[in-house]
């Protein structure tokens, strides 16, 4: 069986790289070494390096572990919290249900 590869949009790659860079900067601002950060997050230094480069092959769970170990987990809750477009689409799709009365033969 051939190995499936996922094709990523350029925007996706750009977002992951920026996210990884933001995590790296957060670590450096706290004067935390990569070895200590990896230990706190429960991941290997190689995985942390991949995260800080924005690798799409690293699991979301590992990214979250780094966020938690940096005290930034609340930022994750902001993702898609205010889905303005989704709410507009939902509101546009809402319709008033009308009851259908059944005709009974009496």
Spans of model-derived segments:
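Helix-turn-helix DNA-binding elements, focusing on the entry/boundary residues of the two helices
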Residues: 23, 34, 45, 60-63
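Short, basic-rich loop-to-helix N-cap that marks the start of a DNA-contacting helix
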Residues: 55-68
């Amino acid at each position: 069986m051939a190995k499936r590869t996922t094709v990523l949009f350029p925007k996706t790659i750009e977002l992951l790289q920026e996210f990884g860079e933001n995590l790296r900067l957060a670590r450096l601002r706290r004067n935390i070494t990569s070895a200590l950060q990896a230990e706190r997050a429960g991941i290997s230094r190689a995985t942390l390096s991949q995260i800080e480069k924005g690798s799409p092959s690293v699991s979301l769970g590992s990214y979250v572990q780094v966020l938690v170990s940096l005290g930034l987990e609340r930022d994750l809750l902001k993702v898609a919290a205010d889905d303005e477009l989704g709410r507009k689409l939902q509101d546009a799709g809402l319709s008033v249900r009308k009851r259908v009365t059944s005709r009974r033969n009496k």
